[in-house]
Amino acid sequence: SNPPRKAILISAFLAAVGHGLRYFLMHAHLFTMDIATASFFAAVSIGLLAIPFAKAIHCPAEVFSFPSLLPMIPGMFAYKSILALTKFMQTKDETDSLRYLVDFCHNGSTTIFVLFALVVGAAVPVFIFHRQSFTATRLLKKLVKKG
């Protein structure tokens, strides 16, 4: 696919909205969410906002939503889990190895849950509004066939 240059600006806008929403949900004073739940709601909001933009520019909603999710990938949790795994394999002390194993499981499960929440959260709006996301590219296909 060859998306227009406007897609970059829209993706950046959606990424800022999603990341800001996730930050707000994790740090609000009335209620606080864990990173996986907040990432799910942020991904749903990105997916919902991508559908009107897709209709306006005649591109698939995934062109906007997938790049917008990239800043929310939990790289630090993934790095800490791999670091704990390598330290676990290198240590000889039993208490340290237990601590590294717990760190690996905690950071690894957090990474997996956040990634799962991002994928499901971005896919839910596309499945719910399948007709709207499908018709966003229909006009473009008709124009290509006529030309």
Question: Where on the chain are the PLM-derived regions?
Answer:
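Membrane-proximal intracellular helices of multi-pass ion channels
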Residues: 2-16, 20, 135-147
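Short juxtamembrane and helix-loop transition motifs at transmembrane-helix boundaries
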Residues: 1-5, 20-33, 101-103
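Transmembrane alpha-helices that form the ion-translocation and gating core
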Residues: 24-27, 33, 37-60
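Alpha-helical transmembrane segments of multi-pass membrane proteins, especially transporters
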Residues: 7-19, 35-47, 63-72, 76, ...
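C-terminal transmembrane helix-loop-helix hairpin of multi-pass membrane proteins
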Residues: 53, 57-147
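Membrane-helix interface "capping/anchor" motifs
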Residues: 1-10, 55-63
